[in-house]
């Protein structure tokens, strides 16, 4: 292992799943995707113990991992890919609670509390996940103290994310303000400078965006067209380029 990279060069490359076209890492110790999230930075002995209680699977996009209201069978670690958490009303209206990137954990709060899952978790891209049964995770966290810190950090991040969304949806005066807030957040999180502005990936449909900001798909389509016509941004198939950041900021009431 080199001091510079921290990468073990003896690690075998992941095998490729030809069905979904993504790589698979069966064991955490061999993982090439390690990030500073949850279990990724544990010592080798802890990772080995964790591997012994997990089940690795690969899922296509639009796979429901668990549904809102179900009893918590266990938690999922999103090794690669992406997922979304949605909540629904009795009338069938759906709101996207959060977009979950690779490296995060799904179902943690319900597994700890024993209460039903508070949202539906669904993959939005081909994804590798590790599943841990609830009773196995509870025992594992009791046996490995270092797990407790990461559990607390994950729960804090979830609370902050929920609070930010409530603020964006609950305090915004219009759909235009909510959309502007969302686009600026995406730009801040993953924007990269380009010749004409800040470019950031958008892997969501107008329907998905509408479910994130609590409005209709038609409203999202109309607002994005208005932003394009005013040359505030350019929309490509899987990305947007923000040209006039200040004009979006002006839509947000302090």
Spans of features found by a protein language model:
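Short aromatic/basic micro-patch
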Residues: 75, 99, 131, 203, ...
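Cyclic-nucleotide recognition modules
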Residues: 47, 98-161
């Amino acid at each position: 292992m080199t001091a510079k990279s921290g990468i073990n060069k003896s690690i075998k490359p992941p095998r490729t799943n030809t069905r979904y076209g993504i790589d698979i890492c069966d064991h955490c110790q061999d993982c090439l995707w390690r990030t500073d999230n949850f279990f990724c930075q544990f010592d080798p002995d802890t990772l080995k113990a964790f591997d012994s209680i997990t089940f690795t699977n690969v899922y296509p996009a639009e796979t429901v991992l668990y549904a809102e209201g179900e009893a918590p069978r266990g938690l999922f670690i999103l090794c690669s890919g992406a997922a979304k958490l949605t909540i629904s009303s009795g009338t069938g209206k759906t709101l996207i609670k959060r977009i979950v990137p690779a490296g995060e954990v799904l179902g943690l709060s319900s597994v700890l509390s024993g209460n039903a899952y508070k949202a539906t978790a669904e993959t939005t891209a081909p994804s590798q996940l590790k599943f841990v049964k609830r009773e196995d995770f509870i025992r594992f966290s009791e046996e490995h103290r270092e797990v407790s810190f990461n559990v607390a950090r994950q729960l804090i991040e979830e609370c902050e994310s929920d609070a930010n969304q409530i603020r964006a949806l609950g305090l915004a005066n219009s759909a235009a303000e909510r959309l502007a807030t969302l686009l600026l957040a995406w730009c801040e999180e993953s924007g990269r400078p380009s010749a004409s502005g800040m470019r950031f990936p958008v892997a969501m449909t107008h329907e998905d965006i509408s479910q994130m900001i609590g409005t209709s798909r038609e409203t999202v389509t109309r607002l994005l067209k208005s932003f394009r016509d005013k040359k505030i941004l350019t929309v490509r198939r899987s990305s947007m380029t923000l040209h006039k950041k200040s004009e979006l900021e002006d839509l947000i009431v302090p």
